[in-house]
């Protein structure tokens, strides 16, 4: 279930820094894909140890929404699965990462037709 991270070094560092600056709590980011990896991302929300707001209107088909699980357990919660269904129907991927962004679990793959090559 856990796999190597599919993030560019810059995108991974941006997310690691945001998580660290938020005190290790959950953060929510939107990433743009290129060649099947997250090439760049923007952090939009910070939450607590167990939850973070997951904005529905800002991401576009072909992008991914990303949040971390501070516990390091990359298993989608019921809330994660509910949101994954909504995002997935819109062509948006859903990714859960650990705090150092070395592992990721891709709950939903993004719609590839909208990705940059």
State each model region's role.
Residues 1-6, 49-117:
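Active-site-proximal loop/helix of nucleotide/amide-processing enzymes and allied scaffolds
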Residues 1-58:
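Glycine-rich short-loop/terminal segments
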């Amino acid at each position: 279930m856990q796999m190597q991270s599919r993030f560019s070094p810059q995108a991974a560092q941006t997310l690691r820094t945001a998580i660290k600056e938020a005190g290790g709590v959950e953060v929510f980011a939107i990433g743009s894909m290129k060649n099947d990896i997250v090439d760049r991302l923007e952090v939009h929300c910070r939450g607590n140890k167990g939850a973070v707001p997951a904005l529905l209107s800002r991401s576009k088909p072909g992008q991914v929404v990303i949040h971390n699980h501070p516990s390091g357990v990359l298993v989608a919660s019921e809330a994660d699965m509910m949101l994954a269904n909504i995002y997935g129907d819109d062509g948006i991927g859903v990714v859960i990462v650990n705090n150092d962004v070395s592992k990721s679990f891709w709950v939903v793959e993004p719609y590839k037709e909208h990705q940059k090559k």
